[in-house]
């Protein structure tokens, strides 16, 4: 798990070693305080118990974790709460971040934002400026800053992502499914109506040219080009109207602006 290729959004302990206990996230409560998403600190101090076996307190439930044969690992799993506790400094260029749901994450030390991968959490943790920490001490989480933007529920996959635009009626690309949707329904509705209006006007103009210039077109065949242009523009506008009418809409969940 210390390799550089580890997905930064995934929990540090895989599901294959989760045992019989499944960690659950507490219900999400919107807190106006910046400490609502402050990851709890930890101290990677290994102390032997009375029998000489190295142990450490779990940073979530404070239970003792046996470190016998695990000192080569960066994190260990608590058998009581099933959460991860770090016992070593993170790899170079990385840092630990603990989500308020107690999921321990690893990310680049320059990261400003990280998302929790647990399906029942899906929080987006905003980290403050990077702080330099000596290698002798475990990395401490940076203070989260108040984000600007909107939590948006994707109209395709239903996942929540942070949209940094401070206005609605824009197109957004979901980072989960990579599909484009409209943030709010006003933009596609307005553009659909506009394209329908322009398309019908072009078709009516084409019909008028066809009826009014039939005799003229028999002598000057270039008149047929104007008919084709009018009908083609009308068809293109109607196709665009169908696109905007069928586009998926993503709705904002909470606004931080």
UniProtKB/Swiss-Prot annotation:
Gene Ontology molecular function: phosphatidylinositol-4,5-bisphosphate 4-phosphatase activity
Main location: membrane
GO CC, one annotated term: late endosome membrane
Enzyme class: hydrolase
GO biological process: negative regulation of phagocytosis; phosphatidylinositol dephosphorylation
Domain of life of the organism encoding this protein: Eukaryota
Compositionally biased spans, kind Polar residues: 13-23
UniProt EC number: 3.1.3.78
Keyword annotations from UniProtKB, A to Z: Cell membrane, Cytoplasmic vesicle, Endosome, Hydrolase, Lipid metabolism, Lysosome, Membrane, Phosphoprotein, Transmembrane, Transmembrane helix
Active-site annotation: 107
InterPro entries in the cross-refs: PtdIns-P2-Ptase
Known catalytic reactions: a 1,2-diacyl-sn-glycero-3-phospho-(1D-myo-inositol-4,5-bisphosphate) + H2O = a 1,2-diacyl-sn-glycero-3-phospho-(1D-myo-inositol-5-phosphate) + phosphate
Renumbered residue ranges of the record's region Disordered: 1-34
Function: Catalyzes the hydrolysis of phosphatidylinositol-4,5-bisphosphate (PtdIns-4,5-P2) to phosphatidylinositol-4-phosphate (PtdIns-4-P). Does not hydrolyze phosphatidylinositol 3,4,5-trisphosphate, phosphatidylinositol 3,4-bisphosphate, inositol 3,5-bisphosphate, inositol 3,4-bisphosphate, phosphatidylinositol 5-monophosphate, phosphatidylinositol 4-monophosphate and phosphatidylinositol 3-monophosphate. Negatively regulates the phagocytosis of large particles by reducing phagosomal phosphatidylinositol 4,5-bisphosphate accumulation during cup formation.
Name of this chain's protein: Type 2 phosphatidylinositol 4,5-bisphosphate 4-phosphatase
């Amino acid at each position: 798990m210390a390799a550089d290729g580890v997905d930064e959004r995934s929990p540090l302990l895989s599901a294959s070693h989760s045992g019989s206990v499944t960690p659950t996230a507490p219900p999400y409560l919107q807190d106006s305080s910046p400490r609502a998403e402050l990851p709890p600190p930890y101290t990677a101090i290994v102390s032997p118990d009375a029998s000489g076996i190295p142990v450490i307190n779990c940073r979530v439930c404070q239970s003792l974790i046996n470190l016998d044969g695990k000192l080569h690992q960066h994190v260990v799993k608590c058998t009581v709460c099933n959460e991860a506790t770090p016992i070593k400094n993170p790899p170079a260029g990385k840092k630990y971040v603990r989500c308020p749901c107690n999921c321990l994450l690893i990310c680049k030390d320059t990261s400003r934002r990280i998302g929790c991968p647990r399906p029942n959490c899906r929080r987006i943790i905003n980290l403050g400026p990077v702080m330099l920490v000596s290698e002798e001490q475990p990395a401490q989480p940076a203070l989260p800053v108040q984000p600007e933007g909107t939590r948006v529920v994707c109209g395709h996959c239903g996942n929540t992502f942070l949209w940094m635009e401070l206005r609605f009626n824009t197109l957004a690309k979901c980072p989960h499914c990579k599909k484009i949707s409209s943030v709010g329904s006003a933009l596609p509705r307005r553009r659909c109506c506009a394209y329908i209006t322009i398309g019908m006007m072009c078709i009516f103009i084409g019909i008028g040219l066809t009826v009014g210039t039939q005799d003229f077109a028999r002598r000057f065949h270039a008149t047929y080009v104007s008919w084709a242009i009018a009908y083609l523009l009308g068809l293109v506008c109607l196709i665009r109207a169908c696109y905007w009418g069928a586009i998926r809409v993503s709705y904002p969940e909470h606004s931080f602006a």
